[in-house]
Amino acid sequence: MRKRMKRSSKNVFPLKIDELEQLMKSEFDKSPDLSFSKYEHQNKKIAVFFIPYQVQPDRVENLLLTPLLESKEEWSNTAILNKIPLNSGKEYQQMDEILPGLIAGKVMIYIEDEAAVVSYDFLNKEKRSLEGAETESVVIGPKIAFTESLVTNLNVIRWNIRTPDLAIEEITIGKRAPREVRLIYLKSLANDTDVDTMRQRLNELDVDNVEDSNVLMQYIEDDSASIFPQFHTTELPDRTSYAILKGKIAVLMENSPSALIAPSTFFSFFESTEDLYMRWNSGSPLRFIRFMSMFISVVLTPMYVAAVTFHYEIIPTQLLISIGQSRAGVPFPPVFEALFLELMIELLREAGARLPTKVGQTIGIVGGVVVGTAAVQAGITSNILIIFITISALASFTAPSYQMGTSIRLLRFPMIVLAGILGLIGIMFGLCMLIIHLLKMTSLGRPYLSPIYPIRFEDLNKALYRLPQNFQYKRFISLSLKDSIRFSKRNAKEKKDIDE
């Protein structure tokens, strides 16, 4: 049954200060980022409330609180607006005006038994220069990335999701070196079981310290022995906000520029931020290319090893002659030849990653050309295998997630060994074991291969390919959300223009 967050649009004033405090705390339930202060002045009770990291605290103190509390006048809304002429003063009477104002960086003042709240704009515009992501390349869409400042990261999330329905729970982890963690989700959307599971794992974490969100992920994921990531890590605020709006849970950590997103599925690691901004008939083929690239990266080199070692009869005659000529002076069997080149590729990749950006790119390109040419001329490897190795390496780069790309690259090594020992049977055995492992995996207790297993036909158009936006009126059924409807299907139908 579809549920929506309901908020009163009526004038709830006048109120007692304690009643207003209870009302605001109920609206910002489980969010520790609401500051609500009570003062008494000239026998009148005054409340000042705002979201701390959305405003400039020095300006609030100097331009608002000091004149307000040091004055000897008897305050009223009119007196405040006249005494503190900051040009942004307004009166709000309804909750559906006050709550968005708080999220937009306004400071609210309420005098007990008045008929309205006085609002001033103190938005914190002096933000740290947000830079681009280091591990996630963005072609279309916002380029900014998270920083090491938890306050800045929360500020960005609040700006992207401007609703009091956004719950931000404060949790502290680490006994010897405590770190602040924020559990973020939408109260009217996220599955309560998922939220409780994540909260329990964080609260029960009994460790001395946690250095980063990537380390935190290894403590709280479902299967720490698996090579595959079960939580999505991202440096992009828009990806995090989009996941929260889909009903997922995000975790931000102090001094960490990455967010954790759960639950995640195997297919979600092949979704790029560009998919959201591109047209469906452009995004779907690109997503299909990523899936095919993953398969090519895992099996292409093992297929070469198996065919040349055991099943050369399946190779076309002309190609077989070329392979024979290229391998004429190679003293090693194909399996050792492939493992050697794969290891060289990984060494060049790792060396390029540890060097400065421009130097690392040069080392990767020049080193690959030099090592490949020298290996062929020395008779250590064949030039045809270099082509297969290069295609496999390029295919692994198409994975938008760095963790998933690393997992795919590492899978090639056992697959090459199996192909060198058992041929095509070894490859099939390796793929079967891989599928069985993926079928057993979960993320926050939910199937990792959803919506393929268990099959959810309604979710296929969101996980494997994309349909036009006006066809995606439902959220993921497999997440068991409180509200599965994104928008009214009837209102999404095409309407005639006015002049038709």
Model-derived segments and spans:
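Membrane-embedded alpha-helical signal segments
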Residues: 1-299, 314-317, 438-500
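Functional cleft and adjacent loop/helix regions within the main domain
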Residues: 311
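Short aromatic-rich membrane-water interface segments that cap or initiate transmembrane helices
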Residues: 283, 321-333
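Membrane-interfacial loop-to-transmembrane-helix junctions in polytopic alpha-helical membrane proteins
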Residues: 278, 282-285, 326, 352, ...
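Generic detector of multi-pass transmembrane helix bundles and their immediately adjacent loops
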Residues: 303-306, 316-319, 331-500
